[in-house]
């Protein structure tokens, strides 16, 4: 187990293909079927990668797409885990009132929107405002986290395209705690043109949140490494690399 963990922070209904494809656990098993996944619609969900399925989502070509959070689960956003094969691409994510965000978990690919284009490597990301969509194309294999949400505007303010890489960002102590750190990807803390944020939190052994967050905002979290116990609603839930909640 690594001594720390990180996580980041959106179709047609019955269209899915292969189950449990992420860990190659296909066919019959020797034990009774079980899962760590928890579905409490309107409260929280935990998705164990062992049970994730491939979905058919328009616009993705030569990609394995798994829907994570969605309105069907009670979320105000939708996010996806995307495994891109050689030559895989998307013809347009977001736009027409939908803001979008793409993060490269592994691999590299070319991305662009109406404002700019970039070559993203592991840790790279692009945020695209609701007026633009993101397209991407990969020359090799890549794993992506993709997020979509209907933008909530504030009069006189607007969001803009942001491109960067987590490896170029400074780790900041999280709320003054020296064993917990954060990297913010978007300037939402001081620019109300951005109606949401994306960040990575890093917890060393023994670190935790300073309090149990109680608020109206929703989170989507994908765990990049490590293991932890996380308080969700009234429950303490074990979470680890590859989990989503």
Residue ranges, per PLM feature:
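A short beta-strand-loop-beta hairpin characteristic of the jelly-roll/cupin
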Residues: 89-122, 214-243
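Ligand-binding loop in jelly-roll beta-barrel domains
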Residues: 63, 75, 116-117, 130-155
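A short glycine-rich, His/Asp/Glu-containing loop-to-beta-strand
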Residues: 53-92, 173-212, 217
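Hydrophobic residues in beta-strands and at strand termini
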Residues: 84-86, 104, 128, 138, ...
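An N-terminus-focused feature that recognizes amino-terminal "leader" regions
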Residues: 21-72
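Double-stranded beta-helix
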Residues: 21-26, 139-181
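Tight coil/turn sites that cap or link beta-strands
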Residues: 85-89, 122-125, 129-131, 204-206, ...
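N-terminal amphipathic/basic-hydrophobic helices that include classical n-h-c signal peptides
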Residues: 1-23
């Amino acid at each position: 187990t690594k001594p720390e963990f990180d996580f980041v922070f959106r179709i047609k209904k019955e269209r899915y293909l292969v189950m449990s494809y992420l860990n190659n656990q296909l066919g019959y098993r020797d034990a009774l079927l079980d899962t760590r996944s928890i579905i409490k619609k309107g409260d929280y969900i935990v998705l164990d990668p062992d049970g994730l399925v491939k979905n058919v989502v328009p616009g993705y070509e030569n990609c394995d797409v798994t829907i994570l959070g969605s309105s069907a689960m009670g979320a105000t956003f939708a996010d996806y885990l995307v495994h891109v094969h050689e030559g895989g691409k998307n013809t347009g994510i977001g736009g027409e009132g939908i803001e979008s965000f793409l993060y490269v978990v592994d691999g590299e690919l070319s991305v662009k929107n109406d404002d700019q284009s970039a070559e993203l490597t592991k840790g790279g990301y692009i945020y695209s405002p609701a007026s633009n969509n993101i397209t991407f194309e990969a020359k090799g294999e890549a794993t992506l986290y993709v997020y979509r949400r209907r933008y909530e505007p504030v009069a006189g303010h607007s969001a803009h395209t942001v491109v960067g890489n987590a490896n170029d960002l400074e780790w900041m102590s999280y709320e003054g705690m020296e064993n917990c750190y954060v990297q913010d990807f978007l300037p939402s803390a001081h620019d109300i043109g951005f109606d949401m944020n994306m960040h990575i939190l890093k917890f060393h052994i023994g670190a935790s949140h300073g309090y149990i967050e109680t608020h109206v905002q929703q989170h989507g979290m994908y765990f990049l490494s490590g293991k932890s116990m996380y308080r969700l609603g009234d429950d303490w839930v074990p979470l680890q690399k590859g989990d989503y909640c």
